[in-house]
Amino acid sequence: MSVLIALTISIGLLAVVATWLFLGPLAAFHMQIWQAFVAWASFFHNGGKTDGLVKTVVCMVFGAVVGMGSVMIIGPLGGLGALAAPVAVGIGAAVLVLGAHLPFLAAIPSSVYGFATVAGLILLGKDMTPTAAIVPTILSIIVGAAFGWVSEQLAGVMTKK
């Protein structure tokens, strides 16, 4: 079986499991399936394997923390009026890129994905403050990246002759 067909089967089946988990047992923790899917994609974007797993979790969590901080400084920047949020996001974006000077934070796209996932959860408007959004976001990132790793492993088993 080709790798692409094996990944099709593996990812398709595991997406069913992940969605069930997030809409069922994990829903009480405010974890989000869409955040997990972003982390799952980031895992493959980072080349998969253990290295892709580590890069995804470390950089997405870093991005999420920076994103949380960016949202939190919008209030103190309120004197800027309509520019408060754009300036806060710009500061956060600069921090993400500066962080890439550290080799373990060099996967800038994954850091951006992390920033976007926490900001997205905050913007859903379900009484989700920045500090309330960070833990479910980090948990969703970890679980999503783990699903990426498992899907790769399962596909590997299906392609062995």
Kindly give the residue locations of the regions a language model identified:
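Membrane-interface starts of transmembrane alpha-helices
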Residues: 6, 29-32, 80-88, 105-109, ...
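Cytoplasmic-side transmembrane-helix entry/capping segments in multi-pass membrane proteins
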Residues: 53-62, 83-86, 105-114
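Pore- and pathway-forming membrane helices of multi-pass small-molecule/ion transporters and channels
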Residues: 12, 16, 29-47, 92-94, ...
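Structural signature of hydrophobic alpha-helical transmembrane segments
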Residues: 20-36, 73-90
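Alpha-helical membrane segments and adjacent membrane-interface helices in multi-pass membrane proteins
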Residues: 33-71
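Transmembrane alpha-helical segments of multi-pass membrane transport proteins and ion-pumping complexes
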Residues: 11-24, 60, 64-72, 89-101, ...
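Membrane-interface helix termini and inter-helical loops of multi-pass transporters
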Residues: 74-79, 124-132
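Alpha-helical transmembrane segments and their membrane-interface boundaries
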Residues: 1-48, 130-133, 137, 144-155, ...
